[in-house]
Amino acid sequence: HPALRGTVVDREDAAPGAQALLATRGLGRRVRFAVGDFFTWVPGGADWYLLKSILHNWDDAAAARILARCAAAAPEGGGLLVIERLRPERLRAGSRDDAVARADLNMLMGLGGRERSLLEYERLLSAAGFRLVSCEPLGHEFAAIKATRMNDADQVRSRETA
């Protein structure tokens, strides 16, 4: 997709490595690097926002703040793609769910975050002003969760029914 353009937002200390990698991959003209903190700023004007293995690092309150920043930056109908490991609603012992349970415990102990179920992501997304559109499995318990920013009237209705 040579017409696509993007912005990577990360800490200042990540800039040299990210810019070098983008240049070696031939993406220097298509992808720019912006120093930022997603708790305080997300660049506006994008058609899509991508969060890959971000939200599971944080508790629900912090994840909600990140999603709220994305919603504030996105236009009505703008897209959000969240790529995360999904925890089943109910874990089954002795199954592949054991790996998700271990990852969940690791996130809690290491960063204070957690793995979440699709229903938990849907609630976080809705509270931030996004509507869940789809969820596609990617393998190894990961999924691509696609959402769009609701218009103001839909956000009011969503809060009223919550």
Label every PLM stretch briefly.
Residues 1-162:
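Alpha-helical subdomain
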